[in-house]
Amino acid sequence: MERVILIRYGEIHLKGQNRPFFEKALHKNIKNSLRSFPDVKVIRAQGRYYVENYEDEASIIDALTRVFGIVSISPAYKLGKDFDLLGAAVEQMTATYLAQRPADTIVSFKVESRRADKTYPLNSMDISKKLGSRLLSAYPDRLKVDVHDPDLRVNVEIREHAYIYHQV
């Protein structure tokens, strides 16, 4: 499991034939904003940018918030697409979140899944249901489901790798 920063960008996809120009400009601006972090890698894949190989997450996120065209930034975990591995990682991320809350607090949650890789054996709804069930089994006294206004929103994206995060 590797820490990454997931970057979503705006309406570049609507620009038609100019799209490559705008994507290159955004990539250049992202790299320029991170020039004081020489070991950082910026990767573009499937409509997202990913920042890898970093140490100072807060400073990098702060630098990225100043880049025009970025819609949202999420600290995330990148891992393989094996469902058991994914479930264990979601449990671990949830445990970290719960450890930051008072022990007697019941936290409402929701699992949201997006499956860009349509060859993945489970659809988005099944991924959300199974991971949600696993979390309820793991933390029955700490979690309750609330799909409308949850305290914790566990996000799962299945792409070339699996990505999990809870901050958007």
Task: Locate predicted features.
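RNA-binding accessory domains that recognize and position tRNA/RNA substrates
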Residues: 1-168
